Regions:
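Carbohydrate-binding surfaces of carbohydrate-active enzymes
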Residues: 1-9, 13-22, 28, 33-53, ...
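Short alpha-helical segments and helix-capping/turn motifs at coil-helix boundaries
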Residues: 3-4, 41-43, 61-64, 85-95, ...
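Structural motif
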Residues: 24, 60, 80-82, 237-240
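Alpha-helix boundary/interfacial micro-motifs
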Residues: 68-70, 97, 127, 162, ...
Length: 244
């Protein structure tokens, strides 16, 4: 259905599909690792047989990381950053991902900045998450060495009637920077600012290396320092003190 839309089938300068996801969050499936690995091999084979030749990836599936299986080792795993975590965990999770698969891209598949609306429950617009949260999550992922960020969601949408998951409303605004109705606010400004930094320094950032350092008297700070090949230093700070 989409094999001809892959970037590998396009002319230089044309847009196309750059990667294909095999599954979603197998870490939460109550299934033995051997069964997960078997299913991953089947999915991978199905893609290859149907002409998919762009990179194949998984989403939070530990079985892929560091695998020596001849099929699974050709995949790479991505991480998710969930909204209910402390923001500084985004840094340590990316560091863990890079350690477990050092020769693969360090991507965040879902850099979440909101949550869905539920019938009889909280709506996306009632979420406590604001521009500071969106900025902090992105910066901490970058501090950990992330080489790719995918906002989930960047823009809100609307389900066709009855097409949503169980207990979900028709609206899928998700508290996104670009809202379901097209509106923007401080979260959009925060994400736009991150995009401007990446646009200007992305080439240096993705090839930067972590810098070891020692900090005293800053218990409420999460700090990350990265050095680019030309000596440029990128310093990331997150104040975890709720009162300041």
């Amino acid at each position: 259905v989409f094999s001809e839309e892959q970037l590998t089938r396009k002319q230089p300068g044309e847009k196309g599909i750059i990667m294909v996801q095999l599954e979603n969050e197998y870490i939460y499936f109550d299934m033995e690792s051997e069964k997960k690995e078997e299913f991953l091999r089947v999915l991978s084979d199905a893609c290859i047989r149907n002409g998919i030749d762009v990179p194949l990836f998984t989403c939070v599936t530990p079985e892929v990381r560091g695998s020596h299986d001849p099929v699974i080792s050709q995949l790479f795993d991505m991480d998710n950053q969930y909204v209910w975590w402390n923001m500084h965990e985004a840094k340590s999770r990316i560091e863990k991902l890079k350690a477990e698969q050092p020769n693969a891209p360090a991507f965040v598949c879902e850099l979440q900045g909101g949550w869905f609306s539920t019938v009889g429950g909280r709506l996306s617009e009632d979420s406590y998450l604001d521009g500071r949260h969106a900025r902090g999550m992105a910066l901490m992922a970058m501090a950990g060495g992330s080489t790719g960020l995918n906002y989930y969601m960047f823009f809100g949408g609307t389900h066709f009637a009855g097409w949503g998951a169980r207990r979900m409303t028709t609206t899928y605004d998700y508290g996104a920077p670009l809202k379901e109705n097209g509106g923007v606010g401080e979260k959009y400004a925060a994400v736009k600012g991150i995009g401007e930094v990446v646009d200007k320094f992305g080439g240096l950032l993705v090839r930067s290396r972590p810098v070891r350092f020692d900090v005293q008297g800053a218990d409420n700070l999460t700090i990350g320092i990265r050095r680019a090949a030309d000596g440029t230093l990128f310093v990331f700070l997150l104040n975890r003190d709720k009162k300041q």
